Amino acid sequence: MEVLGDIEVEGGDKFTTEKVDACNCPQIIYELERYADQPVAFEKGDRKGIIGVLMQALMDKAFNAPKSKWPSLLGTAIQSLREKHMIMYFTDAKNQEAIEKVNFAGRIHEYDGDYLSINEANFAGAKSNLFVQQKVKQVVKKGKDNSLEKKLIIEYKYPRKMDNCSLERKGGLCLAGIYRDWIRIYVPKGSKITKTEGIELSQTEDLGKTVFESFFELRPEGALKFEIEYTSPVKVDGEYKLLIQKQGGVEGHTYEIEAMGKRHKSFPLDTDKEIIFKL
């Protein structure tokens, strides 16, 4: 929409990307939430049916766009794929293999160095993800037999006031509710937790990785901080390599990496990122 402009659907409803003060989010998000979740005195039926109508209008506008907009449309699509706001899947094996080679399939990768991927799911927490801020710091030291001793620090801040989310409310939107988060931390297979602070974790395996997982709640205007210490079987000799994979569909959280006394400048994780420290 930033390329094509405002979208108008049948019935005259208009959608834009301009920020709305009520949620500090694009107008299109606010209007879709209002359509789906605002209490009314009648049965709405298919409360998410507007999405199909909107997508049809968006596709019509894209296919009929002047040629001068095609480069911008293509660039926006590629950027969305790189940043995992769009993920592709094909039933045809050759097509699927092709998109996996360019990292457009959202796969958890095999990697010959250290690895980290944090994946989270909001369970009945309204639209808390619009407002929750997250910062990740990882400190790495060389352990016994050139393996790794690691500390992972994850901080959350939720600066917005809580909305009225009662099912009996007369009006208004429930956007800022209690953030109920299931977190899964993917690390190299064989990693083991040695200490935690602020969170209790279970340990399992999935997709060729060891996974630390837990469930927690964060209330509006609140903050949380977790510290997880663990060992990794990855060996280091001459250099330390780390692949951080971004979760699809989320904004780039801030990351800070320190390894063997060397620091990498903090950065937003907008896409998968490989970091290499020469030792």
Regions found by a protein language model. Give the residues of each.
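Lumenal/extracellular ectodomains and adaptor appendage modules
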Residues: 2-279
